[in-house]
Curated annotation (Swiss-Prot):
GO biological-process terms attached to the record: nucleoside phosphate metabolic process; ribose phosphate metabolic process
Oligomeric and partner information: Homodimer.
Family note: Belongs to the Nudix hydrolase family.
Source species taxonomy: Eukaryota, Metazoa, Chordata, Craniata, Vertebrata
Short motif Nudix box, span: 111-129
Function: Hydrolyzes UDP-glucose to glucose 1-phosphate and UMP and ADP-ribose to ribose 5-phosphate and AMP. The physiological substrate is probably UDP-glucose. Poor activity on other substrates such as ADP-glucose, CDP-glucose, GDP-glucose and GDP-mannose.
Organism this protein belongs to: Bos taurus
NCBIfam families: nudix-type nucleoside diphosphatase, YffH/AdpP family
InterPro entries linked: NDP_pyrophosphatase, NUDIX_hydrolase-like_dom_sf, NUDIX_hydrolase_dom
Cofactor: Mg(2+)
Protein's name in the database: Uridine diphosphate glucose pyrophosphatase NUDT14
UniProt superkingdom: Eukaryota
């Protein structure tokens, strides 16, 4: 996963995942504009494996995180994107700079599937757990990337067991996914969430906090 080679950066051509746009509007009599990205809404799934007394997370390399770290440590590195062709990054970092811990998640990019159906599909593809929509508890929905995408994300919760795991998961190779499933023991989950040196999404932090506040007491877990 962390073996990253031949890193180059270039302009984004036509993409099925995002479209850069500018919204022009008048607010309180003042003409304004705002650049944003049109993208898909998404779902996330927080799973608790009662067989292992652990929370199920995923770990994967995120190119955007990697590029952001390169630019943060070596300002101006992404200026190569102004070129017509992808240009090799002169300042590169180990692949670990782009690896993050996340909740199982997926885009709502398949018309006809409900939020619950997409969540179940992702739980199987990424983590290898068989879920039915009836297994899911809807936690909440919220806006993400409010300054850039304004997309909506819905979080679900599901309790699973080892008996429901029918494959190792790992994502779809044909879609470029390379995912490691992580079973986070409950006794170290709070420390994990609070550690600023562990690269993780806000969804992981919120999910762990929500679990201990809303689920653990009912299961007799502390």
């Amino acid at each position: 996963m962390e073996r990253i080679e031949g890193v180059a950066v270039g302009r984004c051509a036509a993409s099925p995942y995002l479209v850069p746009l500018t919204l022009h509007y008048r607010q309180n009599g003042a003409q304004k504009s705002w650049d944003f990205m049109k993208t898909h809404d998404s779902v996330t799934i927080l799973m608790f494996n009662s067989s292992r007394r652990s929370l199920v997370l995923v770990k994967q390399f995120r190119p955007a995180v990697y590029a952001g770290e390169v630019e943060r440590l070596f300002p101006g590195s992404l200026a190569a994107a102004e070129q017509d062709r992808p240009q090799a990054l002169q300042a590169a970092l180990p692949g670990s700079a782009g690896v993050t811990y996340e909740l199982c998640a997926g885009l709502l990019d398949q018309p006809g599937l409900s939020l619950e159906e997409v969540a179940c599909k992702e739980a199987w593809e990424e983590c290898g757990y068989r879920l039915a929509p009836s297994d899911l508890r809807r936690v909440t929905s919220y806006k993400s990337g409010v300054g850039l995408t304004g997309s909506s994300q819905t979080m679900f919760y599901a309790e699973v067991t080892d008996a429901q795991r029918g494959s190792p998961g790992g994502g779809l190779a044909e879609e470029g996914e390379l995912i490691e499933v992580v079973h986070l023991p409950l006794d170290g989950a709070r420390t994990f969430a609070d550690d600023p040196d562990v690269p993780k999404t806000l969804g992981v932090i919120f999910g762990i906090s929500w679990f201990f506040s809303c689920v653990a007491p009912g299961l007799g877990l502390q």
